[in-house]
Amino acid sequence: SAYDRGGGGGAGGFRELKSPSTPYTASPLDGYSTPGNRITVTATGFPIAVGGGGAADNSPPYTVGANGSVSTFSTISSAGGGGGGRGCVGSNGGSGGASGSTGTGCTARAGGSGNTPPTTPPQGNNAGTTRDHPAYAQGGGGGATAVGGNATAGVGGPGGAGATTSINGSATTLAGGGGGGTDGDSANKGTGGPGGGGCGASGPYPGSSVAA
């Protein structure tokens, strides 16, 4: 089917602030030194919202998955990941969602933009580009520390890599982008980015998803 070619979804925005007095190894995206990022924690309540992944859209043609929802701690927000496109351009988000392709005669499309809205350090990266007729394949979604991979002939692009932090006591990689889908051979679907990105799908079958 022309509508089974979905781009990888982008990871949700990754933001980390580590005080120099805190004894753990932060990711390269530690924003503590950036003016305006710090929050003084006191013995009071803070608004907290834990975002989730966006839902797929299974109604062709030319559809795009929903973006993830925003996560918030006090005044600091991380954008939801951009939804992957299926026959259309992927969405912008914390990390961008990749575009999808459709029928014969289409041209390759760039993916959605990451770091949307912009933060310092960047909360995410752009998605990869599609590969259209005759060897359809889709780009990978952006990850926290790397862009999504571009599709090549019949091979889905890998999801962008996430960020590694030891905030929970051991090195953990978070916010990887989703792999791009393909037509045909399941061995050629895009791999999910390190940090939880789901693999792409081949043919009419659904890709994998992971918890936000």
Regions found by a protein language model. Give the residues of each.
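Low-complexity, glycine/proline-biased repetitive segments and flexible coils/loops
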Residues: 1-212
